[in-house]
């Protein structure tokens, strides 16, 4: 017998469609979907890593490759992982600097989720002998003081892990 949790899925459009092709029109927050967080009272970290990220240099058109890692403490919403994957695919033919990409991913996730905290790490492969790593993060404005302290302590603890992304 199959059992079911209280997860809300009725508004998800991408998951289960079999759609795997790169979206038209480039990256956009409209490609992302979210579902309700069943545990908004508890600060916990969600980490999503996309190790096959590719985009194009806006000057040369040469490919840039790397890993994009998103870490966040959800408030009311969580990002749906397949929509996140398709969002990442949308960068494949998009020309932009690595610094802009990392900050745009942060802003798009903040617009969609309004998380308590979010950090995006762009760990780009060396090109021309230079390795670029970009880190962008933001805390939610206006959290009650007690919640803010708990969130910041959770972030501090998460960041002190030796390698929180290793299985």
Curated annotation (Swiss-Prot):
Residues 1-24 are annotated as: Disordered. GO terms for molecular function: preQ1 synthase activity. Pathway: tRNA modification; tRNA-queuosine biosynthesis. GO terms for cellular component: cytoplasm. Coiled coil: none annotated. Its EC number is 1.7.1.13. One of its GO terms (biological process) is tRNA modification. Catalyzes the NADPH-dependent reduction of 7-cyano-7-deazaguanine (preQ0) to 7-aminomethyl-7-deazaguanine (preQ1). The active site is at 57 (thioimide intermediate), 64 (proton donor). It comes from the Bacteria. Its main location: cytoplasm. InterPro entries: GTP-CH-I_C/QueF (IPR043133), NADPH_dep_7-cyano-7-deazaG_red (IPR050084), QueF (IPR029500), QueF_type1 (IPR016856). This is NADPH-dependent 7-cyano-7-deazaguanine reductase. Substrate binds at residues 79-81, 98-99. Belongs to the GTP cyclohydrolase I family. QueF type 1 subfamily. It is found in: Cytoplasm. It catalyses: 7-aminomethyl-7-carbaguanine + 2 NADP(+) = 7-cyano-7-deazaguanine + 2 NADPH + 3 H(+).
């Amino acid at each position: 017998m199959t059992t079911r949790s209280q997860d809300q899925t009725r508004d998800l459009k991408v998951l289960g469609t079999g759609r795997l092709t790169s979206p038209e029109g480039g990256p956009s927050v409209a490609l992302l979907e979210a579902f309700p967080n069943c545990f908004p009272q508890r600060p916990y970290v969600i980490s999503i890593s996309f190790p096959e990220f590719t985009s194009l240099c806006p000057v040369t058109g040469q490919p840039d490759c790397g890993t994009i890692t998103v870490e966040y403490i959800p408030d009311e919403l969580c990002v749906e992982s397949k929509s996140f994957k398709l969002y990442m695919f949308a960068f494949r033919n998009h020309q932009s600097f690595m610094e802009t990409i990392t900050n745009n991913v942060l802003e798009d996730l903040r617009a969609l989720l309004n998380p308590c905290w979010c950090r995006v790490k762009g760990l780009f492969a060396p090109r021309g002998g230079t390795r670029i790593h970009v880190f962008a993060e933001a805390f939610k404005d206006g959290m009650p003081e007690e919640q803010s302290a708990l969130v910041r302590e959770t972030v501090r603890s998460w960041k002190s892990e030796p390698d929180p992304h290793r299985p």
